[in-house]
UniProtKB/Swiss-Prot annotation:
GN (gene name): katG
Reaction it catalyzes: H2O2 + AH2 = A + 2 H2O; 2 H2O2 = O2 + 2 H2O
Cross-link Tryptophyl-tyrosyl-methioninium (Trp-Tyr) (with M-252), sequence positions: 105-226
HAMAP family assigned to the protein according to its UniProt record, in alphabetical order: Catal_peroxid
Record SUPFAM superfamilies: Heme-dependent peroxidases (SSF48113)
Lineage: Bacteria, Pseudomonadati, Pseudomonadota, Gammaproteobacteria, Enterobacterales
Cofactor note: Binds 1 heme b (iron(II)-protoporphyrin IX) group per dimer.
Subunit structure as annotated in this protein's UniProt entry: Homodimer or homotetramer.
Protein name: Catalase-peroxidase
Amino acid sequence: MSTSDDIHNTTATGKCPFHQGGHDQSAGAGTTTRDWWPNQLRVDLLNQHSNRSNPLGEDFDYRKEFSKLDYYGLKKDLKALLTESQPWWPADWGSYAGLFIRMAWHGAGTYRSIDGRGGAGRGQQRFAPLNSWPDNVSLDKARRLLWPIKQKYGQKISWADLFILAGNVALENSGFRTFGFGAGREDVWEPDLDVNWGDEKAWLTHRHPEALAKAPLGATEMGLIYVNPEGPDHSGEPLSAAAAIRATFGNMGMNDEETVALIAGGHTLGKTHGAGPTSNVGPDPEAAPIEEQGLGWASTYGSGVGADAITSGLEVVWTQTPTQWSNYFFENLFKYEWVQTRSPAGAIQFEAVDAPEIIPDPFDPSKKRKPTMLVTDLTLRFDPEFEKISRRFLNDPQAFNEAFARAWFKLTHRDMGPKSRYIGPEVPKEDLIWQDPLPQPIYNPTEQDIIDLKFAIADSGLSVSERVSVAWASASTFRGGDKRGGANGARLALMPQRDWDVNAAAVRALPVLEKIQKESGKASLADIIVLAGVVGVEKAASAAGLSIHVPFAPGRVDARQDQTDIEMFELLEPIADGFRNYRARLDVSTTESLLIDKAQQLTLTAPEMTALVGGMRVLGANFDGSKNGVFTDRVGVLSNDFFVNLLDMRYEWKATDESKELFEGRDRETGEVKYTASRADLVFGSNSVLRAVAEVYASSDAHEKFVKDFVAAWVKVMNLDRFDLL
C-alpha cells in the first residue's frame, strides 16, 4: 500500500497519520543544519548561558546569598561527610578524602592558560562532556555524595564552590594546612559550548606534546585531564612522559616546582581503582539508562564497589597513610627500586620490588601490599629537572607542604580572575602575581574632575579614531573564561602589551593621555584611557546628529610593571581581533570564526558584536588605519553607514587573491572599486543569522537604535573587569 493510502486510511478511521510510530517526531530530532553544513559559523556560541536557562532568574545575587551562609557550619558538615561511608559507594579506609580531592582537581584541571577557558569556575563537571570523560570515572559518585549538603545549604553555596571547598576540607581533615579558599564561582546551567576540547572522534586518542603548544588543549589525550598515567600512548616509559607532563601543566601556567608539588601532593592521599578488567564497566553517565538517574560506569565485576571498584583500571596506593598527610610519596619514590607490572585490569604500573608489604588494604585491615606508583609518578625521579625538585622536597617536607599549598590554591583559583572576585572568610591576604594584582585606589575623580578631563581630552588633538582605538586596545584584552585582561590597570602602557603589533597605533596616543594624567595630578591613566573613548564616541554621535551620554564609572587604578607577569600576559595577545580588522596568522581557523571567538571572550551577544563592529568601522578604528570595512565617506561619524552600504546590492564583492581574506566591492554598473573589506566585514552580509541583525541596523528607522546599542555594548566592554562595581 502506498504512503498516500496509509494517510487516507488512518484519516478515515479518525487516527492522526503522524502518530503511528516509525520516525522520531520529537523537537530537535532529525537532520540538523550542522549536519548539512558542518562548517557553519558558530554564532550560537554567543547565546550561551542566557537567563532563559537559569532557574534562579536574572535577579539572583550569588554574592548576597553567600553572605548568608554558615560557612564554618558547612565545613563541619563536609568534614563529617568524609567519614560517613555509604554502602552504595563505600569509602576507601573509611574516608572519601582522596575521592573529593580528585573531584576538585579534575574540576579545576581543565583550565588552559592559552585561552582562559575550562577550569572549575562554572561547575562544568556536572555536564557533558566532563561528567562522562574517561578520566572522570566515579566522580559522579563524589558529586552525588555531596548532594545532601548542597540540598541543605541550597543557593547559599554554588556547586562550583562546593566542589573546590570539598577538596580543601578533604586535605585539611587529612592533616594538611591549605593556603586558603576564595568563593565566588557562580554556577551555569548548561554545558560550555565554546571550549575546544580537540577534534579527535575517539576517547583517549594520543596527542604529541609538541602539538599542545599549537592549540588550546590541556591534555595529551582526548578525555584526560592531563597525561596518560601509563606514559605517552601507554608506553610504560617514565622518562618519555616528562615532555607531556611539562606541556600539559605548562598550559595551565604551572612551572616545574608547582608541577612536582601537585603530582606528589595529589598522590599522597587515596588510591586508584582497578580491581578487574575495565570491560566490566558500563556506560558513562550521559549514555547510561534513565533508571541510573545520572550515575554511570556501573560495574558487573563482583559487587562493583568497594574492593571490587574499577575506575581507571590502575590499582595504585602510594603511601602508608592514605588518609593522612605525609611525605611518604617522596620517601617511597626514592627509597625503593621499581619494576614494571600490571594491575588486575591489565594497566601498566610500577611496584616497589624491594619493599615490604607496608601499604594497608582499603577494606581488609588484615591485608597489606607493596607500594605502587604510576608510570608518571616515576617521571619525578628519572627526569633530571624533576628529580632535583623531588629530592629537595624529600629532604625538606616543609618546603613541599608550602609548595603544594600554594600550587593547589593556584590550581583551584586560576580561572577566577583578580582577588577582588573572591569572597568568604578564608581568602588569603597575600597578593599573588598570577592574580594580576592591582594597587589600592588612591583617588576617585569627582564629577567636576571628569568634566575637566573630558575637556582636556577633547582639546588634546587626538582624533575620534585615536580616542576610540586606545580605549578599545586597553579594554578588549578581557577574557570571560578566566576574567583576565581589561582596562583596569592600564597595562596597555606596560610590557608586553605596549609592544604588540595590534596596539602599534593605539599606543601612539598614550603620551598625550599620560601628559593629561600628569597635569591632572590625581586621575589614573586607566580611567583617562577609557574616558578618551567616551569623548570619542560622544563626539562621533554628536556629528551624526545625536546627543548621547556615554556612561563612565571612574575608579580604575594603574598597575606597576612588577605586578605584571609578562609571560602570562603574552597569552592575551590576540591572534586576531575582528573588531579592529586585525589578523596575525592565517593558519588558525577562519577570520570570521576568530571574530566569534573574540566576541565570546568579551561575553558579547550577536547583536552586541554586530553593533560594535559596525561602529568601529565608521569610526575608523582599524588597527592599521586601513580602509577595509570602512563603508562610509564620513569617518568619525557614528552612523549606520557600514550596514547600509554592506547590504546595498549596487555593489558586488570579489576576492583580491586566492587567500580570499581581502575583497573589493565594485559598482555593478561602472566596475569602479568603491570599498575594500575583510572576511570580518563581509560575514555580516554572508551569514544568515548575522545578516538578520545587520538588516535591523541598516533600516531607515534604525540609526538612533544603532547608536544606543553601540554605546551600551561599548560601555559593557569598558567595564568587563570592573568587579568592584558588582
